[in-house]
Amino acid sequence: MSFWAVSRGLTPPGKVAPMLNPNQRQFLEDEMRYREKLKMLADGTDLEDGYVRKPDTVDDPFELDKHDAFYRATKSLLVLFQVMGVMPLIRNPPVKNLPRTGYSWTSKQAMWAMFIYTIQTTIVVLVLRERVKKFITSPDKRFDEAIYNVIFISLLFTNFLLPIASWRHGPQVAIFKNMWTNYQYKFFKTTGSTIVFPNLYTLTYVLCSSSWVLSIAINLSQYFLQPDFSLWYTFAYYPIIAMLNCFCSLWYVNCNAFGTASRALSDALQATIRGDKPAQKLTEYRHLWVDLSHMMQQLGRAYSNMYGMYCLVIFFTSIIAAYGSISEIIDHGATYKEVGLFVIVFYCMCWLFIFCNEAHFASRKVGLDFQTKLLNINLTAVDTATQKEVDMLLVAISKNPPTMNLDGYANINRELITTNISFMATYLVVLLQFKITEQRRSNIA
């Protein structure tokens, strides 16, 4: 067709540009860059400014450890989880083709977790049996007294969720840890700089110690404020409340780290835009951003059952404790017992606020703030190839929104707080209606 057109002086028809998927586009770009490299070698041109995508090779484990600042900064929290038997992850030896973080049911950490869990479960069962027995044999069968017992018994049941909600997802948690390790090294190879997490090391140590200090303070406050709360009951609640605090700390640390990584990526991208031939590097930045977005989703996938079940417990406990305190004030006025219940409500709402608020800030920093910096780039000052790469990065952000969710069950953001508060208000009204109905029946009798 082309020969026929040329021989007759006609213009051949234009070709229709094919539609390529992301993998085909990446392959085509790599081929074009490889040809450009061969041409530069043939011309004797310096290759320092040339860019060719690095092939997927097995990274040196010692280099991974060298650039794994996040693991070193948060190691104290990982060790605390191992000591408490919450998440028995292991750090594999530096061997090629072996992930740096792993999970094994036959490891020393897993055996220790089972041993600690057996002791803790024994104490929980003893306290649970004592509380149920005391409630059954108590002459006071009021609805309010049943509510008080439900609060503390429901907290004890969270202990039995640990093997199902936490240990079962150990391999997914190990994948998430390895994603952080690989991401930092990939960031270094792409940008030439490392991700710096300022004050994260100190913050993690403070959160680890504060988790247990807060647990002891809350349980002792219940011992002094609740008349039927014996001192030996607290030994069953210490590790449960501390575990809740540790999971809240883990969520806070990771959300903070996501924001730091996003800020480092945007700074490196802006520095590249101001340099020569930025289009050749922007593709790698796009892949780095997509990896960061997937890592945020992996956090919710790895801990979906644990955080989901604890959110339900927090929601349930907040409603019951709020009703118990309001009901007791209506009947007998303000006493120390109501103060103890308000402490529980305040703790649960603070836990829920931190959980949702930090996820909101992480999603905004990785998504909206990063997108805003891209939109502020003066595209008239760059070449056409760079403009296309910036557009592709904006498309990647819109197609892969950095939304933190619990494996698709629920999106974690500020809207979840308002939804829970509205549900709490609804259920409180229903419970107070039961209260008023019970009072009317007693007055009639």
Regions found by a protein language model. Give the residues of each.
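Terminal membrane-anchoring module of integral membrane proteins
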Residues: S2-I116, A279-A445
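Inner-leaflet juxtamembrane helices
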Residues: L162-T181, W251-A264, M349-N376
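Short, non-transmembrane cytosolic segments of multipass membrane proteins
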Residues: D46-K75, F152-R168, N256-I273, L374-L375
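Helix-loop-helix junctions within predominantly alpha-helical proteins
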Residues: M111, Y117-L156, T181-L250, R263-L282, ...
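Charged, amphipathic alpha-helical oligomerization/scaffolding segments
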Residues: F152, L156-N159, M179-N182, K186, ...
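Non-cleavable N-terminal signal-anchor transmembrane helices
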Residues: Y71-K177
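Long, hydrophobic, amphipathic alpha-helical segments used as structural scaffolds
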Residues: A165, T191, I273, G300-Y303, ...
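Non-transmembrane, amphipathic alpha-helical segments
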Residues: R142-E145, A165, Q172, M243-L250, ...
